[in-house]
Regions:
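Conserved HGGG/HGGXW glycine-rich cap/lid loop of the alpha/beta-hydrolase fold
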Residues: 10-62
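Acidic catalytic loop of the alpha/beta-hydrolase fold
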Residues: 220-224
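Active-site loop/oxyanion-hole signature of alpha/beta-hydrolase fold enzymes
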Residues: 39, 47, 54-93, 260-261
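Short beta-strand/loop motif that positions the catalytic acidic residue
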Residues: 209, 215-217
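Catalytic active-site module of serine/aspartate enzymes centered on a nucleophile-bearing elbow/loop
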Residues: 239-268
């Protein structure tokens, strides 16, 4: 069910199914992203006895655009959203750029979360020795001019292992969420200045997270994710890391059944 609620002065749209312990899903930040990325996941979680919630982050989907476009604002917004829906604690699922946001908010507010599931987050993996990033950074996948259906196809091609799952319906949905205020927000995010914190890389702080933690990736995800997962496991053997074969960055969509099964097993 689609609902709206006021959070930090912004009309915030969210999808909610089921009743029980809350599980909150955070979508990524590429052009066209929204809570609808979890349409293949919410029913399974609701059916397993959870209150499954995915919300459009500020500047995405049907949620108002914010004044502050930095990812750090959207990170703090997570706790404000939990307060608004009367969830004192929740399991948190963060996809892509939101995996890093989820890790940071769990470090900052450990008592607010029961479990942490980081999905396809390049920002929580170590770099391979001698390698530099290639392609657009997380949250920068998009266009500099008003996007077209073909632009959406190019973005989705980079996110799917099985290209046959990229339907016209999916492309049209993503395009709809890319236009108007959402395209304005995408451009504003690309220009936003993030706080320069320096310090310890996020992947070195994962061991500080005090709640059960699972890192989950499509085995064919971009950015050498599988190799970087292996490197992280070597560096931090206690971390739980799983790969789903025949899936890329949008593992939540193209391998939804396997993702749901793995995530629910972790939560229970």
């Amino acid at each position: 069910m689609e609902r709206t609620i006021q959070v930090d002065g912004l009309k915030t749209c969210y999808l909610e199914e089921g009743a029980g312990a809350p599980v909150v899903f955070l979508h990524g930040a590429s052009l066209g992203s929204s809570a609808r990325a979890f349409e293949r996941n919410l029913p399974a979680f609701a059916g397993a006895g959870f209150r499954a919630i995915a919300y459009d982050q500020p500047g995405f989907g049907l949620t108002d655009n914010p004044i502050d476009y930095a990812a750090s604002y959207r990170t703090q917004f997570i706790v404000k959203f939990l307060d608004a829906i009367d969830a004192s604690r929740a399991a948190l699922v963060g996809h892509s750029q939101a995996a890093g946001m989820a890790a940071r908010v769990a470090l900052q507010h450990p008592t607010r979360f029961t479990h942490l599931l980081l999905v396809g987050g390049g920002g929580v993996l170590p770099p391979l020795p001698g390698k530099t990033g290639g392609g657009p950074a997380e949250g920068q996948e998009g266009t500099s001019t008003t996007p077209t259906l073909e632009d959406m196809r190019k973005i989705m091609d980079n996110n799917f292992f099985n290209k046959g799952l990229i339907t016209t319906e999916l492309l049209e949905q993503r395009l709809k969420m890319s236009l108007g205020k959402n395209f304005d927000a995408f451009i504003a995010r690309s220009r936003a200045r993030e706080p320069q914190g320096g310090g310890v890389p996020l992947y070195q702080r994962l061991k500080e997270i005090s709640v059960p933690l699972l890192l989950l990736y499509g085995k064919q995800d971009r950015g050498s994710a599988a190799q970087r997962c292996a490197l992280l496991k070597e560096q931090e053997p206690s971390l739980r890391i799983e790969l789903i074969d025949n899936a890329a960055h949008l593992v939540i969509w193209e391998a939804a059944d396997k993702f749901n099964e793995t995530a629910l097993r972790f939560l229970k």
